[in-house]
């Protein structure tokens, strides 16, 4: 038995979930090959259940781990809906990393990214990374209500004239006034994926997850657009406190289906007529805390089960005048998506650019085959795209669609920037 954490479930009441791990170097984001990962139940951390190794791309195979029945995440109960595991990661030339509290849900693929610190040559004290409980299971402070539309500042202007998707979010890991809390620079999409994985269950319907991701996106982009905390004298974008913003946990396990939804809609936010700024869409769990005129997370789950679309769920809580908008500017991206997919038979400059970017990425991720930069989308380009999609947890289609275009751009910018610094 892998699932040994004492939950209110019998041994006959056990499902399975999945885990895949990707290890990168903390100082340059280069994949860490041949890292060894020991997996243990949190209740018995010194009794490894599995041992797996990363490949040349820093990625492990997907493994099956025991998880509580899926029903535990379908309605509020006294049964913890996820199992928890500890990871110990070791690799030549790097300090050991320990992560405690990796959460596995029934039927879902957990993606655990691990940032490994190069060995400094001197012995260090272990400081395990502890992943806190999910917001729908643990008790966190309820959101302090705010106006959903922020007033202009005293100078009569808001710093940004248009809604921009930032390259990074600066997350203050505590309350705004906690000067001991650390600030983290987090890529925008990774931040949204982390928050969604903290706030809702990946076992919920696609429609419900999409509605909640839209609310998280809009809330976050309101903080970016209004420069809410910077206007108060702070040097960060948002906090990890549920009393002020949403939950974000350093090194949190994210889930593949949530990741793919975020990649598909990360430029969207929620608007009202004649209001430029993204709406500060606040929400609560809807069970322990109720919040009239805000979205109920559990309520949105039940609406999704009934077949409501994401915008129908949104309007059920925020009103019929709410609509989905899209940011025109994405920071840090070489070129915007052309508006159409690239696939077998496509030709031209956009194809050449993708080929060039894939070849650069392949220098860091060697399983991606290099291709001839000729502007013709043939079988070799399709194969390179498919391998890229496998590595970065996108649907493997061999087609450069909207999510794949921006993921290639993001990774290309990352590896190119790192090369400039070396």
Regions found by a protein language model. Give the residues of each.
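Beta-strand-rich domain onsets/edges
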Residues: 1-32, 44, 52
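Solvent-exposed strand-loop boundary residues in beta-sheet-rich modules
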Residues: 27, 41-45, 93-95
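A short, solvent-exposed loop/turn motif at the edges and junctions
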Residues: 70-100
